[in-house]
Amino acid sequence: MSSGANITYASRKRRKPVQKTVKPVPAEGIKSNPSKRHRDRLNTELDRLASLLPFPQDVINKLDKLSVLRLSVSYLRAKSFFDVALKSTPADRSRGQDQCRAQVRDWQDLQEGEFLLQALNGFVLVVTADALVFYASSTIQDYLGFQQSDVIHQSVYELIHTEDRAEFQRQLHWALNPSQCTDSAQGVDETHGLPQPAVYYTPDQLPPENTAFMERCFRCRLRCLLDNSSGFLAMNFQGRLKYLHGQNKKGKDGALLPPQLALFAIATPLQPPSILEIRTKNFIFRTKHKLDFTPIGCDAKGQLILGYTEVELCNKGSGYQFIHAADMLHCAESHIRMIKTGESGMTVFRLLAKHSRWRWVQSNARLIYRNGRPDYIIATQRPLTDEEGREHLQKRSMTLPFMFATGEAVLYEISSPFSPIMDPLPIRTKSNTSRKDWAPQSTPSKDSFHPNSLMSALIQQDESIYLCPPSSPAPLDSHFLMDSMSECGSWQGSFAVASNEALLKHEEIRHTQDVNLTLSGGPSELFPDNKNNDLYSIMRNLGIDFEDIRSMQNEEFFRTDSSGEVDFKDIDITDEILTYVQDSLNNSTLLNSACQQQPVSQHLSCMLQERLQLEQQQQLQQQHPTQTLEPQRQLCQVEVPQHELGQKTKHMQVNGMFASWNPAPPVSFSCPQQERKHYSLFSGLQGTAQEFPYKSEVDSMPYTQNFAPCNQSLLPEHSKGTQLDFPGRDFERSLHPNASNLEDFVSCLQVPENQRHGINSQSAMVSPQAYYAGAMSMYQCQAGPQHTPVDQMQYSPEIPGSQAFLSKFQSPSILNEAYSADLSSIGHLQTAAHLPRLAEAQPLPDITPSGFL
């Protein structure tokens, strides 16, 4: 600043430093210039001193030597003031140093001072009695455009309008009456450009510090680089005069001067901001870019919002690396529009902040010309909320292929190199996604694209920025998965008590799904209830893929080796099913209560096979009238999918006599006899040896796949005069009438419901003591102390067609030899051992009127 008519104001004084090159030290002792060695040592010390300043690295890199010395002196003076003002001794500081460091580490991300300054509508300014800026907050840049490092330890008069300097000098005096001339130019040293106070005051000459006489409130105009109209901004200063301790200044005689007064004030704009400025003044930031959108600068507000320093932002490379892949082409279109017209218009996109977080911003970029040619780009950005960003994304026109998933491959004529990232189905997290999963087999290299292209910028982005981990990542354990499966099983079991029509429809749908899964295969077979259930949604939200679910099911659900199984690989065993099976086998009350039954349609092939066995039993009964057949070796065993067992156990015995067969129309078929296969169905149950007295028989339960030959769609009728013997005790005749056709025969098939709890059904046929043949329990039939012989049941001779049915299937070549061998091996001793307990046995559920035990 000069005097008279040649008055100048403050401007940006920072100079861009020259890039320094480190020269190698010569191997031999070559003589060098002593003055050069002195300059090198001085520059080294200045660089070390600059690194200790509490400023960002980008600011330090642009400081000249005088600015480094000026800011170093200002920092030391401020430190001395706080040491005295806070009244802390060196001993106290040493004791609390460790605690302060721990608190700084704990609250490193919480910059309370920055938040207070942002909430303040203005900036903090401390001016000494000799008009030097002792301190200015960093928010001075938002109002005046000057950096904090530009004004500290500079004359405040360089910032004040010439017409307001006298008023400002008057406010600095404690009595509002400075002894010198009001013309500030006369009190200025031409050599240093600083006002020289005439008198230094002692505390005895000054009023108390806390008096109202020390309060100040005035207005003046300050130099503003952001105002293009007048270049000045009217500010209101409100504060008070306080002692500036710890300066240790000396007078002309060398004596130590007492602390002098200084103005501590808050400068706020005199003109109140508009509503829009109040909302956005703390969020709008500006960035500077090259013509190819490479960032070369960012203001302090942008560094606070994005979290980057200016050096980190400028050394990254292309600016498109900070843009979301789905918004790259949208921003590229605005970039081209700006090159053609000079302004991009409002563009909404996602900007990458630090710590891999995306921020929605609304940007408007302009071209800045120099000498008639475009020089650089200034982009003004305003952060948006996530809701506002989604609204703009929905309104965005999709006529152009802006989305990467739809347009990027078309533009570059290649497949997407980040297909796992853009895949919407599997939501992966860092914990369960390895690096190999992200590396596709045909990933193009960086050299195959132009370094300034969008694809090159996309490839240079880190894959982790597109990962979306949950806010509270909880480790996935097997208990959570088991609970989800149990809830799913309970939900399925609630449908078991519905009406018969709904049950049959549900079974038909599930059987159709099982057939489709078996035919299609693949990862979908892990979900037998299709992909619309709650379990599948939970798996997707947790980021579990099909392989993880398969391994979890093998470890937590199966608990058995399924390497030799054929059709049991899709079994989804739950705790509910295992508990129900175990209770059903252990509970003896199942055999002591009368049950009510409901008819249910069965598959034709099972009925044909059962009817064949009934006729086979008739022949054996006629040959051995005193021999009791062992029912467990004559039962038609069919496979029941385990995922249907949870509902089937609510209607029938666990042995699976009547499973859910495919309700296909009856057709003629012929199946050859197959070899028996043994499956250990209950090997996973704990405590079976103590709870089941016949564990060996249960574990070795035969699984047979024997199909009877049949060349007609309907059952032939029985011949007249054919008798069927029932060897056993406490047997009564069937309450059902004899059937003359297939419909009547099917109606005799009874399936109990709610047998375990004794719940009465609404539409059921009550048979208190009727004992039917055709099904059996897992337990062997044990005899009771009382037994009463009953007469044998005979078929009515009036039924036509019975003899034709027997004559057709009594051929030795057609009958199953496996059953004949087992029947022949049954002895009278084994039957007699179980006869005493027959009185305790009650009617078994799934039995036809004609059959065997």
UniProtKB/Swiss-Prot annotation:
A motif (Nuclear export signal) lies at residues 63-71. Residues 440-451 have a biased composition (Polar residues). Expressed in all tissues tested including brain, heart, kidney, liver, lung, spleen, skeletal muscle and thymus. Residues 1-38, 429-451 are annotated as: Disordered. Residues 116-179, 273-340 form the PAS domain. Residues 1-9 form a propeptide. One of its GO terms (molecular function) is DNA binding. Residues 37-65 are annotated as: DNA-binding. Residues 26-79 form the bHLH domain. It is found in: Cytoplasm; Nucleus. Residues 346-384 form the PAC domain. Induction: Induced or repressed by TGF-beta in a cell-specific fashion. Repressed by dioxin, retinoic acid, and TPA. Keywords: Activator, ADP-ribosylation, Biological rhythms, Cell cycle, Cytoplasm, DNA-binding, Nucleus, Receptor, Repeat, Repressor, Transcription, Transcription regulation. InterPro entries: AHR/AHRR (IPR039091), AHR_bHLH (IPR033348), bHLH_dom (IPR011598), HLH_DNA-bd_sf (IPR036638), PAC (IPR001610), PAS (IPR000014), PAS-like_dom_sf (IPR035965), PAS_fold (IPR013767). Its main location: cytoplasm. A motif (Nuclear localization signal 2) lies at residues 36-41. Mono-ADP-ribosylated, leading to inhibit transcription activator activity of AHR. Residues 49-81, 116-124, 264-266 are annotated as: Required for maintaining the overall integrity of the AHR:ARNT heterodimer and its transcriptional activity. Gene3D superfamilies: Helix-loop-helix DNA-binding domain (4.10.280.10), PAS domain (3.30.450.20). GO terms for biological process: aflatoxin metabolic process; apoptotic process; B cell homeostasis; blood circulation; blood vessel development; blood vessel morphogenesis; blood vessel remodeling; branching involved in blood vessel morphogenesis. Homodimer. Heterodimer; efficient DNA binding requires dimerization with another bHLH protein. Interacts with ARNT; the heterodimer ARNT:AHR binds to core DNA sequence 5'-TGCGTG-3' within the dioxin response element (DRE) of target gene promoters and activates their transcription. Binds MYBBP1A. Interacts with coactivators including SRC-1, RIP140 and NOCA7, and with the corepressor SMRT. Interacts with NEDD8 and IVNS1ABP. Interacts with BMAL1. Interacts with HSP90AB1. Interacts with TIPARP; leading to mono-ADP-ribosylation of AHR and subsequent inhibition of AHR. The PAS 1 domain is essential for dimerization and also required for AHR:ARNT heterodimerization. This is Aryl hydrocarbon receptor.
